[in-house]
């Protein structure tokens, strides 16, 4: 498994608090998807961090879609 460098994540999303929220929300989404599919996969938290590091996840201020 490739190690995820925190500096890489911070370079993608400079605010550590926003970074934490983005990663945790994505990890929850992945967990729910895996639960529905009943798939055993890697840790959703690690997957979410990898997605941020690979620029697969972006965020925008004011784009909070929590209902």
Curated annotation (Swiss-Prot):
NCBIfam families per UniProt: rpoZ
Keyword tags: DNA-directed RNA polymerase, Nucleotidyltransferase, Transcription, Transferase
The enzyme's E.C. designation: 2.7.7.6
Gene Ontology molecular functions: DNA binding; DNA-directed RNA polymerase activity
Keyword Transcription belongs to the record: yes
Pfam family, one: RNA_pol_Rpb6
Protein name: DNA-directed RNA polymerase subunit omega
Function, in words: Promotes RNA polymerase assembly. Latches the N- and C-terminal regions of the beta' subunit thereby facilitating its interaction with the beta and alpha subunits.
Family: Belongs to the RNA polymerase subunit omega family.
Oligomeric form and interacting partners: The RNAP catalytic core consists of 2 alpha, 1 beta, 1 beta' and 1 omega subunit. When a sigma factor is associated with the core the holoenzyme is formed, which can initiate transcription.
InterPro entries (alphabetical): DNA-dir_RNA_pol_omega (IPR003716), Pol_omega/Rpo6/RPB6 (IPR006110), RPB6/omega-like_sf (IPR036161)
Keyword Cell membrane in annotation: no
Catalyzed chemical reaction(s): RNA(n) + a ribonucleoside 5'-triphosphate = RNA(n+1) + diphosphate
Organism whose genome encodes this protein: Dictyoglomus thermophilum (strain ATCC 35947 / DSM 3960 / H-6-12)
One cellular component term from this protein's GO annotations in UniProt: DNA-directed RNA polymerase complex
GO biological process: DNA-templated transcription
């Amino acid at each position: 498994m490739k190690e995820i460098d925190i500096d890489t994540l911070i370079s993608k999303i400079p605010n550590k608090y926003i970074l934490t929220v983005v990663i945790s929300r994505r990890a929850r989404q992945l967990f729910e998807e895996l639960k529905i599919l009943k798939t055993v996969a890697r840790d959703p938290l690690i997957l979410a961090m990898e997605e941020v590091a690979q620029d697969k996840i972006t965020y925008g201020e004011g784009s909070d879609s929590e209902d």
